[in-house]
């Protein structure tokens, strides 16, 4: 299997996000890397499902609550940016203050 650097990055995000999902399901709070990976993964999957950039930016503020992350994480995550593939091409999606 030959993967580009971008594909390797996305695979790493997916791996970390699956770990984050398991931890959330067990009632554990996410740390900074897990929270960012989880948010990025949901953007990638939303784009794959055909959602627009605007929809993802709006929904992205509802995916994680402060009580689902470790203390201090919301203050560290002011924005998450990820390039996602949409039906009309690759676009940058930015989530502003996504953990509320």
From Swiss-Prot:
GO terms for biological process: urea catabolic process. Pfam families: Urease_gamma (PF00547). It catalyses: urea + 2 H2O + H(+) = hydrogencarbonate + 2 NH4(+). It is an enzyme of class 3 (hydrolase). The keyword DNA-binding does not apply. Its EC number is 3.5.1.5. One of its GO terms (molecular function) is nickel cation binding. The keyword Plastid does not apply. It is found in: Cytoplasm. Pathway: Nitrogen metabolism; urea degradation; CO(2) and NH(3) from urea (urease route): step 1/1. Keywords: Cytoplasm, Hydrolase. GO terms for cellular component: cytoplasm. InterPro entries: Urease_gamma (IPR012010), Urease_gamma/gamma-beta_su (IPR002026), Urease_gamma_sf (IPR036463), Urease_subunit (IPR050069). NCBIfam families: PRK13241.1, urease_gam. Heterotrimer of UreA (gamma), UreB (beta) and UreC (alpha) subunits. Three heterotrimers associate to form the active enzyme. Belongs to the urease gamma subunit family. This is Urease subunit gamma. It comes from Parasynechococcus marenigrum (strain WH8102). The gene is ureA.
């Amino acid at each position: 299997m030959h993967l580009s650097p971008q594909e390797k990055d996305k695979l790493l995000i997916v791996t970390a996000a699956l770990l984050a999902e398991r931890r959330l399901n067990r009632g554990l709070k996410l740390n900074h890397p897990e929270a960012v990976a989880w948010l990025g993964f949901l953007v990638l999957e939303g784009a794959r499902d055909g959602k627009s950039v605007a929809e993802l930016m709006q929904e992205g503020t509802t995916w994680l609550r402060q009580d689902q992350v470790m203390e201090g994480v919301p203050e560290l995550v002011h924005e998450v940016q990820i390039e996602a593939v949409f039906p009309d091409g690759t676009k940058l999606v930015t989530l502003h203050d996504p953990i509320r």
